């Protein structure tokens, strides 16, 4: 199922690029709506950097992106540069093998990224994001901790209320589909997650 979601997301990005090129305004610098901040609530599917096992987590999150350069850094095309701050939460229902449903976990992410937007048309914009993310992982056992429990990735997961903090490089590629100058549907695919949200430009 996860592979199908990723393939569909890639297809959406590819189709958006093809359709946008027909009415491209990428060569018209500054031809995009001005905004002070972009707020984006979204759904989260975390498929990478899972806490101690191979499983997908489902949750919600929020992004706030603030333009740093309104027309640039390349002044000959329609682009801008923003800094983006996020808060994402994902829940993992089970530990996976060998413990299965004996425990579950939660991840909280605090990403800070640079976002480079390319406005291809009045409807479609594409953007890469690169930065760092703080990952806070929590594990909770649903019952008695099994005797065969072992350390995973150097962390003792065999206690109640286990937690761990890590710092990761994060990367997303995204597309926006504008419904108006103030509202857009936004999809991101990258590491560690797939994000589906609605952007509100203020």
For each of these PLM feature ranges, what is it?
Residues 27-34, 86, 153-202:
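Predominantly the C-terminal beta-signal and adjacent terminal strand-loop region
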Residues 44-50, 69-71, 88-96, 121, ...:
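Sequence/structural signature of outer-membrane beta-barrel proteins
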Residues 51, 88-106, 136-166:
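Flexible, solvent-exposed loop segments that connect beta-strands
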Residues 35-37, 54-60, 104-110, 124, ...:
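Residues that define the transmembrane beta-barrel architecture of outer-membrane proteins
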Residues 1-32:
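Cleavable N-terminal export/targeting peptides
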Residues 25-36, 69-81, 119-126, 179-183:
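Short loop/turn motifs that connect adjacent beta-strands in outer-membrane beta-barrel proteins
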Residues 41-45, 60-66, 87, 110-116, ...:
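Residues on the lipid-exposed face of transmembrane beta-strands in outer-membrane beta-barrel proteins
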Residues 22-70, 190-192, 199-202:
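Short glycine/proline- and aromatic-enriched beta-strand/turn motifs that initiate or cap beta-hairpins
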